[in-house]
């Protein structure tokens, strides 16, 4: 405003009190400060949030904490490995039975019987393991709506689905269902791709992004991974930044979970090939991911699906998207529904 006033003052010789160079410089200064201030504000807000969360001790997950696991099934070929994973992730002595869901589209009533048969198979497997399980054959206008409503109605803590099996090159890694669920469900989402039976896995490779310890779902997914390692009696190799590795080790001690773990400082997120060389056929890779706009989200996660597809084609895979309540992450729906994947 001052520059514009000065530019509008005409001197006796006909020139402006403040010339065009000053006016252009002021405009450039305003542009630069507006751009820089937005990045500085975001960076400062993140640092303040990290400092506040770092000052508070992370609570341990009680051994008797109620489980509210929901297994969403659709493919009859993956029922057995998905049920086995669900049973192994269930906290011992939990009084809350896991749930199994099959969604029937309103325009496809013929799928009702197929869903009933699949749920019966789930019940038989759970009964053989002496575990009670509740099953639902639910009508809905679409699969995502049916699953998300079930999650909310039953206060689900963990949603388990199978990884999409690509039929065309144009399809995305997670598939339309997985991508839509990431935006619709705020609870912890586990996406599993089985290659070999889970009880034959000899080692877990856990890949964790830096600053994951500051996310609200940190203790929850650590509890699940610890349970899985105990159930199949295998060791865990953890890959992350040094501060996050320290937090992971302390958290397992706090939760009093006996986990045999080796910790590796790892920064080569843009190239997972060195890590893939360590993951043998009898091993399983677990990737802890993050939704866009959260503290632990990094730009390399946009390329993660393509790298995993190229480097881990014949390995058991488990992708974990930690619980991220809207009140903790952001009030903007655009950030909550942003997906760290390449949807084609």
Residue ranges with predicted function:
Residues 1, 13, 119-123:
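N-terminal secretory/membrane-targeting helices
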Residues 2-44:
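Structural signal for the N-terminal portions of transmembrane helices
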Residues 14, 54-55, 174:
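Short secondary-structure boundary micro-motifs
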Residues 30-49, 154-197, 277-344:
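Gly/Ser-rich helix-loop-strand patches that form or flank binding pockets
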Residues 31, 40, 55, 66-68, ...:
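Signature of alpha-helical transmembrane segments and their immediate interfacial
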Residues 47-64:
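Membrane-proximal cytosolic interface modules of multi-pass membrane proteins
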Residues 59-278, 286-289, 293, 321:
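Structured cytosolic domains appended to multi-pass membrane proteins
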């Amino acid at each position: 405003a001052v520059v514009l006033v000065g530019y509008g003052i005409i001197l006796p010789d006909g020139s402006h009190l403040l010339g065009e160079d000053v006016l252009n410089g002021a405009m450039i200064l305003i542009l630069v400060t507006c751009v820089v201030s937005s990045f500085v504000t975001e960076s400062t807000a993140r640092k303040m949030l990290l400092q506040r969360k770092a000052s508070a001790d992370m609570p341990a997950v009680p051994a008797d904490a109620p489980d509210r696991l929901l297994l969403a099934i659709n493919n009859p070929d993956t029922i057995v490995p998905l049920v086995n994973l669900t049973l192994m992730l269930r906290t011992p002595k939990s009084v809350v039975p896991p749930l199994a869901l099959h969604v029937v589209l309103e325009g496809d009533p013929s799928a009702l019987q197929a869903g009933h048969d699949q749920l019966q198979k789930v019940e038989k497997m759970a009964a053989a393991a002496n575990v009670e399980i509740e099953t639902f054959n639910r009508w809905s206008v679409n699969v995502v709506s049916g699953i998300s409503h079930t999650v909310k109605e039953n206060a689900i803590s963990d949603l388990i689905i199978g990884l999409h099996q690509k039929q065309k090159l144009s399809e995305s890694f997670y598939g339309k269902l997985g991508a839509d669920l990431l935006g619709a469900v705020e609870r912890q989402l586990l996406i599993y791709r089985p290659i070999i039976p889970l009880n034959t896995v000899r080692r877990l490779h856990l890949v964790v992004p830096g600053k994951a310890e500051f996310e609200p779902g940190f203790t929850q997914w650590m509890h699940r991974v610890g349970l899985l390692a105990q159930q199949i009696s295998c060791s865990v190799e953890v890959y992350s930044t040094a501060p996050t590795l320290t937090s992971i080790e302390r958290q397992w001690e706090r939760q009093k979970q006996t986990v045999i773990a080796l910790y590796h400082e790892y920064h080569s997120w843009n190239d997972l090939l060195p890590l893939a060389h360590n993951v043998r056929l009898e091993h399983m890779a677990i990737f802890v991911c993050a939704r866009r706009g959260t503290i632990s989200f990094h730009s390399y996660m946009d390329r993660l699906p393509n790298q995993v597809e190229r480097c881990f084609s014949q390995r058991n895979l488990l992708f974990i998207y930690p619980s991220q309540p809207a009140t903790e992450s952001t009030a903007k729906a655009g950030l909550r529904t942003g997906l760290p994947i390449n949807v084609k």
